């Protein structure tokens, strides 16, 4: 036989455990929902090359917002740079782990290596811009230099290399690249 005090202790412990489990489930579901929302524009864009082009356009819109800032908008620059870094990092992860790997498998190794090499410079620009004082008069010119690299990289992919890869792949292989790329993007979304 238990005392009233033991019943209260047992019920309190059970209530806390149930509350903790419910909180964990809600947190996990919220994270999955957030990931789905971040990856949805890519999924809805269509095939892998169209999805990557849509991500390119989204990144350029963030560049546009950054270029409209002045040297006094340091908090806004920091926030937008963080958004840009997240968007491009997820994008690069998809390209490097699926698209560039498929390019190598399809005889486009030199081009894939070149694109991957450029991603190293993208990381360098992010480092430099993050380290610079956001009010520094040299910050915006550095951002514009970065945008020039990004736009050149995007044009090379969209106008030349991605069409070459798409043409080398069967419909089934293109479908597989789309699915694999979305899976990789979901990991970082």
What are these regions (language model features)?
Residues 1-189:
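Small-residue-biased structural context
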């Amino acid at each position: 036989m238990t005392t009233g005090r033991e019943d209260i202790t047992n019920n309190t412990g059970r209530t806390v455990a149930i509350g903790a489990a419910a909180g964990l489930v809600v947190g996990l579901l919220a994270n999955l929902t957030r990931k789905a929302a971040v990856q949805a524009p890519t999924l809805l864009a269509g095939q892998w090359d169209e999805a990557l082009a849509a991500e390119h356009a989204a990144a350029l819109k963030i560049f546009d917002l950054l270029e409209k800032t002045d040297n006094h908008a340091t908090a806004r620059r920091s926030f937008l740079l963080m958004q840009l870094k997240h968007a491009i990092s997820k994008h690069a992860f998809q390209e490097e782990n699926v698209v560039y790997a498929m390019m190598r498998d399809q005889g486009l190794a030199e081009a894939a290596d070149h694109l991957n090499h450029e991603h190293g410079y993208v990381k360098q620009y992010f480092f430099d811009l993050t380290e610079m004082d956001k009010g520094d008069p040299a910050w915006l010119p550095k951002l514009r230099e970065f945008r020039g690299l990004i736009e050149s990289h995007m044009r090379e992919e969209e106008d030349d290399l991605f069409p070459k890869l798409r043409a080398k792949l069967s419909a089934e292989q293109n479908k597989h690249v789309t699915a694999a790329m979305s899976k990789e993007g979901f990991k970082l979304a």
